[in-house]
């Protein structure tokens, strides 16, 4: 069970007591409305903060300090959750009860997080220019590596054309041009502003009591002058009109991406039915798209669907030969129409239900998966706790899935055609 504590206005701790693990975790996230003008800066910030503090001014010093904390680790945390982008740090550390000779780990870990957040290496009124330039190169490399994965690239292009006036079309890490414009002083000014204004979400998993950790976290944040600006609520997909676009590229396998929209989100009652519909339609090896379009008809090399529950968007991605484009388009639509017409078997529903339930069962397998699921779910606006979600999935019937399918409409598509095909 998750306990929720408001430490200060706009500062929330979500507390998950669990003594099963030797490791605990603590995440710190600044939650921002997703915006093109700051996405790249938010993506860059955690990496710069991790480069050094006033007491531990370089990576070697940080590594030695974490080794002293029984091999603790701190990593960058950048997420996109619907209309939000989060930027922050994730800490993993041994529980105090496993330390030798009564050593403490939790309190020094929280203090080190404080130093990373509030005592960075400074230079001429900004972050270290060397640190910023180095991490800009790393971020650009990450952005380009995603672009070099043509499946990921095509999916991102689809979301851009579907969401020209919706924050969901903004890349999670920003773009190369935005990264290149960032300088150390501007990044520090931005950081100071979002520390003051942003909603702060912290998530703890471990065996410490709330009475133990809350004073540590309050003390960590006491030095921040806050002027919290309320965060807008998540919104469903903003439809600015559909598009069907194409692009050519020197690749051997073409990529077809199709986007469908629905009013069903994770904030509506029939969310579980839409999750099962997505699984039956295209998510997994028992889905209609995989079993029919790929296996029986051999029309594609790969195919699958994904449901963005915060926005009410389902996307289908397929790796195909260019000459099969129209055939594959038509067959994807036909497989959805089969669902809409009620041609779903009990076997398909059972397989889909078990796939979703299996995923839910793994949520509590590790501190990291607990934090990842629940921290994201709370930001996304999901109205069901884990057990309510599980029961909702169990109770879904074929008629519910068919009703969910009937709400889906094709909105946009993007075709990335190989020039050599």
Feature names for model-found ranges:
Residues 1-69, 101, 175-178, 188-292, ...:
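His/Glu-rich zincin catalytic helix
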Residues 139, 143-147, 158, 162:
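Glycine-rich, mobile lid/loop segments that gate access to catalytic sites or pores
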Residues 141-145, 242-255, 357-368:
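Short, low-order "capping/linker" segments at domain edges
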Residues 14-16, 22-42, 59-115, 151-174, ...:
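M16 family metallopeptidases and their MPP-like homologs
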